[in-house]
């Protein structure tokens, strides 16, 4: 018997893209999970699309509404809701992302293998850009990771795990570790660095999985440019740009 695993997807104004995310989750090779979609106040039909999918999904689906604005609040509400209902493993992606078919299986394998948190590989969505755009996105990930390693706030001697940049849209964590570090900051994005460093102070059990692949929307790259997007992924904010470029 498998341990309960829930996939949590925060969503805001994603009526144009959430169908792709849900289709990708339905195509997982490991479908022994419950899907929880946490809507953050959408007015564009996102919730209706989620409910339509739930009616025929190949796994249990629940849809919540989180009125407190911010992806951190939506994720925290979703994770705690899942934990209260027996989840021991939690995976997260976003409503504009496309998890590859082995994503859930890789997340489960990483957590079962002893990791407290597993972070995966990010790629650009193939339906949003060509080869040049995907190469630019790969360069962005490398740049953001290199910049992050140099930041003083990521180099504290109290950290028990080495720095590696990750985006919240491709991660998995045990329920015990999530609760032990106090959960996701309940605030608007960016939140990933705060959460990541809470984990790094608490445990060395952070793993990277090349098999845990998510295709990421490049809307932010198109809106901010490479350096601006790198700053965003480093949790330095949007520097006056629209923090939610939909």
Language-model features: where?
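Short, acidic, metal-binding catalytic loop of nucleotide-sugar glycosyltransferases
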Residues: 23-32
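A conserved acidic beta->alpha catalytic loop
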Residues: 39-48, 97
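Glycine-rich, basic loop-to-helix element that forms the pyrophosphate-binding segment
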Residues: 66-85
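Short beta-strand-to-loop acidic/aromatic patch adjacent to the donor-nucleotide binding site
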Residues: 86-98
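Conserved donor NDP-sugar-binding/catalytic core segment of glycosyltransferases
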Residues: 102-134
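Short, flexible, basic/aromatic active-site loop/helix in glycosyltransferases
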Residues: 120-127, 136-163
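Acidic donor-binding loop at a coil-to-helix junction in glycosyltransferase catalytic cores
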Residues: 189-195
